[in-house]
Amino acid sequence: MFRFRRIAAHPKTDDLRVFLSSGTTSSERSVHAYGDLALYDAAARASARHMLFPDVEKMRLVILAPHEDEAPSSSLEYMLARFADWFGTQCTWVWRDGALDLELLTEVLRQAEASKEAVAVLGTSFAFVHVEDGLGDRRFELAPGSRVMQTGGYKGRSREVDPEVLLDAIAARLGVGTPRIINEFGATELSSQMYETTLRDDIGGALGPRRLWVPPWVRATPVDPDTLQPVHGETVGILRIDDTANLDSVCCIQTADLARRLDDGIVVLGRAPGAPPRGCSLAADQALGAQ
């Protein structure tokens, strides 16, 4: 819907910020116009505080994504810039002019390693894939308290990666335990984000299965692809998200992602058969693959 119509409760002249989807799989790009970002900011800050930074007020951030000045229409880059404001003691953006600066990344991580300063490394899944491709035998032992947030899917421009293989590779590369490597689920069409629970579980000493925590103002429901009615138990369906932070547009979003319920959360299993890959991770792979 967002690809075909501008959907907003305010006139176009009152747009404060307009986010566009990556436009990687279709000539039409989803358009999400905001007349006010206060609710978006409140939702993003509350979720990240609860799931990504529950044990620290601020820490050093290393970001494997463009700065919002380089990608002003990206909701992900906007969110990461706000994370730098809210949660960063200092922040290094290692994506410069459409490419990852692997030498800068190495320098920053070596500095953190030497000073025993915990860091949060944030980026798309395929940015981490390209880090794996480019760093060779360089390995790090980041300080206790360090963490990783990856976002986006695992199907890129020319290949698909196994999420478990990537998880283990990131852990081995950075010296961070796999429970402290979590996935964030978001979209241009949404104002809220969902995060995997293992970091918070690990901090609390009660590690459970990987699943996405759903904020209390969001409802995530797997539905039958034929009837669009909710499925029961752990039956796989396509994910519907009701996001009340989308106050100025449409709250109910029907995705093409496969999902099932698990305990108190949701497990996303990838795109439904026949659905085109999309999103920030695919865009990162396309940009970096062109280097």
Question: Over which residues does each language-model region extend?
Answer:
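Active-site diphosphate/adenylate-binding microenvironment
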Residues: M1-L20, E28-A33, Y40-A42, A46, ...
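Hydrophobic alpha-helical segments that mediate membrane insertion or helix-helix packing
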Residues: L20-T25, E196
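Alpha-helical substrate-recognition element adjacent to the catalytic core
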Residues: Y34, A65
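Active-site glycine/GP-rich loop and adjacent strand/helix microenvironment
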Residues: E57-R60, H67-D69, S73, A81-Q291
